[in-house]
Curated annotation (Swiss-Prot):
Annotated EC: 1.3.1.71
Gene (UniProt): erg4B
GO cellular component, one term: endoplasmic reticulum membrane
Stated name of the protein: Delta(24(24(1)))-sterol reductase erg4B
Described function: Delta(24(24(1)))-sterol reductase; part of the third module of ergosterol biosynthesis pathway that includes the late steps of the pathway. Catalyzes the last step of ergosterol biosynthesis by converting ergosta-5,7,22,24(28)-tetraen-3beta-ol into ergosterol. The third module or late pathway involves the ergosterol synthesis itself through consecutive reactions that mainly occur in the endoplasmic reticulum (ER) membrane. Firstly, the squalene synthase erg9 catalyzes the condensation of 2 farnesyl pyrophosphate moieties to form squalene, which is the precursor of all steroids.
Biotechnology: Inhibition of erg4A and erg4B might be an effective approach for alleviating A.fumigatus infection.
Keywords: Endoplasmic reticulum, Glycoprotein, Lipid biosynthesis, Lipid metabolism, Membrane, NADP, Oxidoreductase, Steroid biosynthesis, Steroid metabolism, Sterol biosynthesis, Sterol metabolism, Transmembrane, Transmembrane helix
Amino acid sequence: MTVTRSQTGKTPKKLERPGYVETPGRRVTRSRVVVASETSADDVSDSATEIRGRSKSTTRRRQVKTEEASEGEEKGRANGHINGNTNGHTNGHTNGHTNGHTNGHTNGSTKKPRVIDGWVEGSDPKIDYSGEFEFGGSWGVLSMMIGFPLLMYYMWIGAVYYDGKFPRPSEGQSMSEFLAHMGHLVCEGAYPSLRAWIIYWVFFIFEALCYVLLPGVTVMGRALPHLGGKQLPYYCSGVWSFYTSIALAGVLHFTGIFKLYTIIDEFGPLLSVAIISGFLVSFVAYFSALARGAQHRMTGYHIYDFFMGAELNPRMFGILDFKMFFEVRLPWFILFFISLGAAARQYEVYGYVSGEVGFLLMAHFLYANACCKGEECIVSTWDMYYEKWGFMLIFWNLAGVPLSYCHCTIYLASHDPATYRWNRVFLVFLYAAYLFVYWVWDTTNSQKNRFRQQERGTMVSRKTFPQLPWQTLKNPKTITAADGSKILVDGWYGKARKIHYTCDLYFALNWGLITGFSSPFPWFYPIFFACMITHRALRDIQRCRNKYGEAWVEYERQVPYLFIPVSYSSS
């Protein structure tokens, strides 16, 4: 599956070339360079990269702003008045005056600077001029930094000590006694032991080495306006990293050096290590950026800036991009290995792997594999281009995604298979339906991606597994907008406008459904994701209407269905 965005049109045409992954045995010395597509409003969300479900109920993916700076106001606003600027004034200008002109007026012959993603052309990129705060500002992000780790511990306690039920005070137990008891359970069962630290960080370092040393392809990122259109190279070795990790994990398990079910046995301590690591790495990332003067779009509010991040493109050795590294290898690899560990534990205890655990193992493998085989498409996403490397990205990838989305697996691993056994006919149906929806999901995003690549002359064919039928449309039907951009009205996007969201939600619901309804915690991810994806779909629709105008109205007329051909349609 590939997931790309449209480009600006500045990329020169080039011939389609077959993709490759180099064989192991030597360090890659030459990697194909592919120019990443620019993001367009109609494909702002990618299944393999955006479904990561970060805690963004009010997601930050704002459309690139090209409106003019407002009468001397934008240039001095800087989100809380940084560097001694007061009352919204900058560079010594007062009362909203810009460039020496009074009352905020500019010379009619002088072109006003554009505001691009919080940066005013020609201004200091270290300052955020957008005037916008997400998640309720400093108080909101502080609540999230405190609340989500507590929620993770609460769900873990419920899963382990309350048989998957909500922990609540027992009869006659005061709230203070209940909270003290909860704290005792965390100290007793989730103490960050040395063994847990070694497991977590050996995996972390190993994956970093795989990122740098294994074969892959190099992809050029989107142009960065504040750097004069400079494009950064991104090295994509996810496919080799994933399969190398699986092979080594198998060797360690079968030789007895490290049994895979150790991940299940040590889940509590690993949870604490991941949470602590999320905070530690966030502190190092923030203060090292300040010390090196590498901060970008800062508001001057330290709690908020710590959460959103200080540095835009943190790198090591010129090849290891930390945002790229954290995006796939840590969250989705860990989630897959937790499911693999559950299967190993079940086989150790019962002598077989239940169909329900096998279902989750299949689902998590397909998802992690999809992220890897389309890794070159991540470089054009909003996370890589706009989001800074702060607590939001760091904590969510180190702890939030792998250790809160896994409760479906934890529930199955903690209970006898007889307690959640589905009817065998229904289970076969779940497998078949899931694989069908995966095909729709994969080919939907592939059609969108390859349409954009063909349009810009950057089509690259990679023979990564799995290659599925109907991934590429020949002479697809399109609608041309007034600005010359095209809307794909063919293939799956000729049937429903957000059909890839339908698939995403189907996956999430199945992860909960396979566990049954005895515990609420496996349903945390499906419910959270359903709320997020609904909000995102409505937001995307509005952005597309603004971008494409009458062309989008025509698209809605030709394709009236939003999610599936019988679903709600916006009008």
